[in-house]
């Protein structure tokens, strides 16, 4: 495994750590929250003509599941509903959008089905490799469409990197840090290795028997590349901040294109609606689930449904004065904040007060 930075982790180490996977037997033990029933009713009444033919059978299965749930649960005993079909349809609808040129994109059915059919198995696989998940609650990351998040016990993505890094080493794998991949080696149409360069300038050439996996995290920290391909956002400013690792600059995409690979959906980058407006850092302030916060603009007005997808939240935020909004929290909500500590919250409060009073 090649890693161009001094340590492995990439964007995973910067995430909230949640894995979205439908596990109804676990989720059904938790009560439904306000608004979830209404979301299901909206899906039940969604225009079938808006659904791609490949997804129709799953959509009709989901409608039957929702009808059964609504008929067999009362307000007193409503539980958190979920199914693989709900995950699949929400993945499809959540990823369906048009760009400024009226070009529509949506998830390839076979790929979405593979994801939603197998992601729970991946959670179990991660558990088998030593990742400990908090089973005391079902998480819902900002911009997710449903409560189905499996969250590791340790903050952010640390458990994945620690345990999977150890797994590679204990199974005779090798990790080369500060080693930048520069070119895929091809024989005919087959990729058989990779050329790389270490931080000291030394060249590295690795030959493989089973190809090369490009797991390089995209290009979210490369503003010029985002601007080059963008067809979705009205504007991506030169000075826009990012929650991404500075390593996420599109290296893998360039490697693939050089080797003749096709690209798809490059104009549709995702923006993260909540981050530090000065630094782009993700985990400052109080980050909690959408059921526990309200977004307000500088005028103190709520301006969006907090349960919406990240693109909807981001577009709504950019329409506010200076692109700034606030997450309203009280002491009870503070206790639910993720990926932070009491000391860190107090330090941020002190810094905020100092910045506004000096």
Role assignments for model-derived ranges:
Residues 6-7, 19, 26-27, 182, ...:
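Short, glycine-/Ser/Thr-/acidic-enriched flexible segments
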